[in-house]
Amino acid sequence: TVNNHVGSYRREIMVPASWNGKEIIAHFGSVTSNMYLWVNGKYVGYSEDSKLEAEFNLTPYLKPGQKNLIAFQVFRWCDGTYLEDQDFFRYSGVGRDCYLYARNPKQQIADIRVTPDLDAQYQNGSLAVNLTMKGKGTVELELLDAQNKAVTTQSLNASGKVSTTIEVSSPHKWTAETPYLYTLRATLKEGGKTIEVIPVKVGFRKIELKNAQILVNGQPVLFKGADRHEMDPDGGYVVSRERMIQDIQIMKKFNLNAVRTCHYPDDNFWYDLCDKYGIYVVAEANIESHGMGYGEETLAKNPSYKKAHLERNQRNVQRGFNHPSIIFWSLGNEAGYGPNFEAAYDWIKNEDPSRAVQYEQAGKNGKTDIFCPMYYNYEDCAKYSEDNSMQKPLIQCEYAHAMGNSQGGFKEYWDLIRKYPKYQGGFIWDFVDQSVRWTGKNGKMIYAYGGDFNKFDASDNNFCDNGLISPDRVPNPHMYEVGYYYQDIWTTPGDLSKGEIKVYNENFFRDLSAYYLEWEMLKGGKVVRSGRVDDLKVAPQQTSTIRLDLGETCQCTEWLLNVSYKLKNREGLLPAGHTVAKDQLTLNPYKAPSMDLKNVETTNIETKAPVVQDSDANYLIVEGCGFRTEFNRENGYLIKYEVNGQDMIKEGEALTPNFWRAPTDNDFGAGLQKKYAAWKNPEMKLTSLNQRMENKQVIVEAVYDMPTVSAKLNLTYVINNKGAIKVTQKMTADKNAKVSPMFRFGMQMPMPRYFENIEYYGRGPVENYIDRKGNADLAIYRQTVDEQFYSYIRPQENGTKSDIRWWKMLNEAGNGIEVVASAPFSASALHYTIESLDDGARKDQRHSPEVEEADLTNLCLDKVQMGLGCVNSWGTIALPEYQIPYGDYEFTFILTPVKHSIEIE
């Protein structure tokens, strides 16, 4: 084989003399892609399957009390590689712990299996215990509760295969909500002497398939999941225990209750954590062969690979059998469908009837207990859910592709899941961006992806970066949206005039007594009242009405009610006070301000209209008390806006129409950088620039022809006596023209960089968009421009805030401008130009830290910006209601100079 590189590993070790006479086993947790093992120069054996442990009996080869040489070879590729075609970095080498252990060679519990179950009323429990013995002896079985107190004991005279059942009255049940674990302690004795002790964690739970649903302990739970590769930005396949605990903590923090081990068995410690902290697991076998095709050529139909398909699934089940967190076995991923998978399904269902078995390629009618498609769109999900002939639960094994700035439209998936009983959730692709830490061109740290290392290796560029969190485990902005729609407590209005709210407990197994409710009333974005409710006894799947002492409101402004639910005590990895759910209700709706710009009048002083200087050949100048504006006669744009000696527009720049954004990964996947290209720099032919005086205000109107998009555009500026400017951007489309939609309709104004401070009343604090804003509460926020930029691994549109009531750009002294509009609008302010974040017609090998900041603050004001979408990243765009089709649009906003303006501290 060409370029089949080899890694050779050698280590000299001292085996304790006390191990003499014992059976010594070598454990290799994960070696990619295979290994040949020698001990003291003698060949021991061979193993493949990169993601399952290999164990070898080294007893005949080792010399206890002496130095011993362990040596093994690892090949880059082997025949098993055809079944390991996963989409991720293809590393080689040792990825998990390697160690030796010693046991009694004649007497041991060779295998122990526990199968928990509940009775038909889900009340009492039973634990089937199956032992495989080497030799014989007495095995004492002791079931301990979480406080290490004995619940029940049994004693068996054991040899060969032995089975028993332990009955437990009303045990604590294991679920992701209530991950209660018992410990079964199996002690092997001979003549009163303890030979070995094996503890096994036990969770009492029952998995059933009934009425087109999967039930856990009789309840049709919702799977709020993500797919997780084992990847670390520094260790690659080597993921530390601390990193795994961190991942579990993040999952619990953002309300994830399920994980799919894509696309191979994980480190055993991961399943231990899922057992302990409560995560439902889809345990997947290490099979993916999409490179070989899905038709007749698939390896799923190749008899030569039948044994490999079967063994990989058998070993996956055998090593994970005792974990209560494993609810589903998955036969593999993207590997076609055929007899090889059918044989694996049959074997698992016979070996372990206590769990569900799934496989995406089996579709609706093949051998799978779950219909688990990938990237089903909303319509297909609804259609399947309404089809009564389909009697398998719908749980997408991959959905809501989280590539770059994404997860727009995530709400709509969960609207369907909460509507249809058969649709029980899914697993977001995927949990963590899989890039590696690297040094970029300018010496800054970047996260490298495919193509960064050379131009000849197979690569899918940044398609490894589809995570809810960054490689170093910082939540990406879209993770906050997921955390919101995955939450388990929901608040809706009751009779708000009486302070009544309705609280729905979406949990299936626990009431809300572990939480307290905090509420805040906001008047015009500011908190004016607050309170707390400690007694929340809302039963699972029930709604209760709670009355809050809200007091009086008025119709004068917008009133909002924030409600959040927090832990009373530490729970698992989450601290006391952690917010598990929240909602924001409207008490009195927002009313947009009048766009009737008036002069500022002072008592006993005559109002002086602005002065127009119309004689300059290059500029139309409008001046007034403490301000000066200049319009370029060549293009009609406002190029100077000076107030109290301070320029609001950076020299050389202008306030200009804006229809473009730096394409997101989803935009690129749909080819929008080309399909929408007419809007990137549309030709703007100035046909007239006029000014007139009305009511002691100057009105400047610039009229444009936009031939490349078959439209007309009017920019109208009304300037009052203090330099406030009402801007109206009005576009009229040609109804007969066929022109693409646009990314946004608005304007951009590059300002001097020292406008570093932002205050706004809108959604925040993280970026949010028209189709991704459920998590972002309305409030008054004070932030810096530096804080607006989110360093997605590949540069793209970011930093936008939506539903803005007012927005201020301020310098350190609190001086600047305030923006209000005729309706809530979107805005962003970055130290980057749109052009600098835009790859152009095709993706380049670019990284956000390598993009140079501009010496300006680029303010974008939008009537609307297109949504982000999340169905996939290779063609499907945002829902129609979140698109901006070609048509007539009008956007009116007012720029008002402000001094010493600080709303909040």
Regions found by a protein language model. Name each.
Residues 63-65, 132-208, 554, 559-599, ...:
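Extended acidic/polar, glycine-enriched regions
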Residues 76, 175, 549-556, 571, ...:
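Beta-strand/loop-rich accessory regions of lumenal/periplasmic or secreted enzymes
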Residues 3-109, 134-136, 265, 280-282, ...:
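Accessory beta-strand-rich segments of carbohydrate-active enzymes
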Residues 79-82, 87, 103, 193-502, ...:
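Extended substrate-binding grooves/exosites of carbohydrate-active enzymes
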Residues 155-170, 525-556:
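Intrinsically disordered, low-complexity Pro/Gly/Ser/Thr-rich segments with frequent PxxP/GP/PP motifs
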Residues 133-138, 508-515, 737-741:
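A short beta-turn/strand-edge loop motif at beta-sheet boundaries
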Residues 44-45, 64-102, 176-185, 562-590, ...:
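Glycine/proline-rich low-complexity spacer/linker segments in large multi-domain proteins
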Residues 1-27, 78, 82-86, 91-94, ...:
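Extended carbohydrate-recognition surfaces in non-catalytic/accessory domains of CAZymes
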